[in-house]
From Swiss-Prot:
Disulfide bonds join 48-76, 64-90. It comes from Macaca mulatta (Rhesus macaque). GO terms for molecular function: cytokine activity; interleukin-13 receptor binding. It comes from the Eukaryota. One of its GO terms (cellular component) is extracellular space. This is Interleukin-13. One of its GO terms (biological process) is immune response. InterPro entries: 4_helix_cytokine-like_core, IL-13, IL-4/IL-13, IL-4/IL-13_CS. It is found in: Secreted. Residues 1-18 form the signal peptide. Belongs to the IL-4/IL-13 family. Keywords: Cytokine, Disulfide bond, Glycoprotein, Secreted, Signal.
């Protein structure tokens, strides 16, 4: 009986080692890039009905700034997965209406153009090995 109990406890403890670990940032970035590629390639109608978002400064804090812009687009299922993925990169909680200093305050662009610009920038970061 003691041997059985010891075996059960050992297997329970070792089970924690086999649990899934967080996805590496490089893999998460690659998946985000693939999602943006899918969005840009599968455009038959204007993305998000031609909704406009604030342009962002792509040189710093790109993930949170991109999420802050996209979070204000409602009723667009095409970018919901992208929003969730960006949320994983952003260390703080982003809510609709939040304003970042990283946005170019006077410039709004269509979501489709925003996604294309973001895709180009993220591909560049991936090539350079900058995953943060």
């Amino acid at each position: 009986m003691a041997l059985l109990l010891t075996t059960v406890i050992a297997l329970t403890c070792l089970g924690g080692f086999a649990s899934p670990s967080p996805v590496p940032r490089s893999t998460a970035l690659k998946e985000l890039i693939e999602e943006l590629v899918n969005i840009t390639q599968n455009q038959k109608a204007p993305l998000c009905n031609g909704s406009m978002v604030w342009s962002i400064n792509l040189t710093a804090g790109v993930y949170c700034a991109a999420l802050e812009s996209l979070i204000n687009v409602s009723g667009c299922s095409a970018i919901e997965k992208t929003q969730r993925m960006l949320n994983g990169f952003c260390p703080h909680k982003v809510s609709a209406g939040q304003f970042s200093s990283l946005r170019v305050r006077d410039t709004k662009i269509e979501v489709a153009q925003f996604v294309k610009d973001l895709l180009v920038h993220l591909k560049k970061l991936f090539r350079e090995g900058r995953f943060n």
